[in-house]
Amino acid sequence: AYPTFKLAHLIRGDLLLARAHPLSTIGNATGATQQQTDLRDEARARLRRYLEQMPVNRVPKYLVQFQPGQHYAVVVDTGKSRLYLFQNDNGTPRYVSDFYITSGKAGAEKVKEGDQKTPLGVYFVTASLPRTRISDFYGTGAFPINYPNEWDRRQGKNGHGIWLHGVPSNTYSRPPRASSGCVVLANPDLDRLAKDLQVGLTPVIISDQVEWVDAKELAAQRSLLDQRVEDWRRDWESIDSDKYLRHYSKSFSAPGQNFRSWNEQKRQVNAGKSWVKVKLSNMSIFGYPGNENMMVVTFDQDYSSNNLKNQMRKRQYWKLEN
């Protein structure tokens, strides 16, 4: 019958106080402490979720294409202190649930170690840390993500230790802006989410303002991107260096290479080829928050030619330039 967490106690106190006189604010009191301010912020964030209905028949624009084995995707909106869970329903993203979250004290778009910000981008769960392997501060479990990713490092961003995790055992939830950059959930919510997270597979897409689109728009974008990747694959098989290299930006980079060195290398390699076959499978495509027209494309690649065979997991960052 009684509340079990701090915000609920604050609301209960307001309800009792309202019997005596009208309230002027949440946590009606003069000279509010920092804790009261934090609780008010949490109340506003939670109330906003119920006042603003979920977009009907719309999904985050980032969920362009799941790979077949990717069962779920996580989308975080730091601006609304909300985490959304979507299921891969035969390639179509279906809303499952959403949860209140805490993010970085200094806001979003992490740049460097210790800036107290939550990163924005497309990330993937890299590990599952049970309660027995972490301190009580992190709650019932933790799921590290791959910040900084390849794009972050290219932008000169650094830092480490960005996790999805819970809260201490004596706490139910934390204020909207209270972490050092991690995404923090109440322990019951983390436990619910944990069942659907796949290490190495589940994308965690973090935005400061999630954009929603209808299914038709998303399907059209999926078709366009699939065709662009297929054109790239086919032009690679053609051994026509000009056709192949037209897919690459002049600002292209790979470990130890820029566009100029990549251009020279591919022309030299193609000169020794009489045939090339490239098969792509298990491909996912996710839009990158804050970078219009940029997509993270991940796939299994099976390459064979007259003088080389290899298989690898490849991740590329595609961007429409012209």
Question: Where does each model-flagged region fall?
Answer:
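Alpha-helical linker/edge segments of TPR/alpha-solenoid repeat scaffolds
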Residues: 16-59, 275-278
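Gly/Pro-biased beta-strand-loop elements
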Residues: 51-163, 168-173
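Exported/periplasmic cell-wall-interacting domains
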Residues: 129-230
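Short, well-ordered alpha-helical segments enriched in acidic and aromatic residues
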Residues: 238-255
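Surface-exposed, charged secondary-structure patches
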Residues: 265-315
